[in-house]
Regions:
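DUTPase catalytic domain/fold
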Residues: 1-189
Length: 189
C-alpha cells in the first residue's frame, strides 16, 4: 500500500513482483526483486534512492471481520465514539460537512502547479502553498470538481483497539470509485 504521507500528496504507487498476476500482492515463499510503479497525480515530486513511498503489510490467516464481529467489537470497545456506527459490509465512514466551528473549513483542495515536493522533506512546506481550504455552503454541501484532489475530514471519530488494525477499502462500487484509502490519516484528536 502507499504510505499515508505518499497518498496525501496524491502520489499513487503499486507494488509489482515477478510472476504475480496482481498488483500489491507478493505470494508466500517469493524470492526476487520488487518493483514500484510511481504515478504523481497532482504535484511534481522529487524521489531518490531510499525514499519511502510504500509500506508492506504481512498477513496470515483470515484478515477481514464480519459485520457481526465488527458490531460486537463496537459494542465492547466503542470503535465510533461520536455517533452511530454504520456497519454494513464493513464500517462506513462519511464526510463531515459541518466544518470545525469558527471557520467552517471541511477540507482542502490541492493547488495545481504549486511547485516541486521533495518527498524526503515532509515538514518543509507550508500548507497554503499547496492547498486551498474548502468551505461548506449554506446548504451544508460542497461541489467537487472532476479530476481534482481533495482531503476531507470524516464525520465519524474512530478508535481502533490495540488488538486490531484497520484499513480503508480502495472503493465501494455502489457509490463510485474514489481513492479514499490512500491518504488515510488517523489523528489523536
Amino acid at each position: 500500500n502507499p504510505k499515508s504521507s505518499t497518498g496525501r500528496v496524491d502520489v499513487f504507487t503499486r507494488l509489482i513482483c515477478d510472476g504475480s498476476h496482481e498488483f500489491d500482492k507478493v505470494p508466500g515463499g517469493y524470492k526476487g526483486h520488487l518493483w514500484l510503479e510511481i504515478s504523481p497525480r497532482t504535484f511534481p515530486v522529487i524521489v531518490r534512492q531510499g525514499t519511502r513511498l510504500n509500506q508492506m503489510r504481512f498477513r496470515r490467516g483470515r484478515i477481514t471481520s464480519s459485520d457481526n464481529e465488527l458490531k460486537r467489537l463496537h459494542s465492547e470497545e466503542g470503535i465510533v465514539y461520536n455517533g452511530k456506527a454504520d456497519i454494513s459490509e464493513g464500517l462506513a465512514i462519511s464526510v463531515n460537512l459541518n466544518g470545525n466551528g469558527e471557520d467552517e473549513i471541511v477540507g482542502y483542495k490541492a493547488k495545481r502547479h504549486a511547485g516541486l515536493i521533495d518527498l524526503d522533506k515532509p515538514n518543509k512546506y507550508s500548507v497554503s502553498k499547496f492547498w486551498d481550504p474548502v468551505f461548506t455552503n449554506d446548504e451544508n454541501r460542497i461541489i467537487l470538481d472532476p479530476g481534482e484532489f481533495y482531503i476531507l475530514a470524516s464525520h465519524e471519530s474512530i478508535a481502533i483497539p490495540p488488538s486490531h488494525a484497520a484499513e480503508m477499502v480502495p472503493f465501494n462500487p455502489s457509490i463510485g470509485e474514489f481513492r479514499v484509502h490512500y491518504c488515510l490519516l488517523y489523528t489523536s484528536d
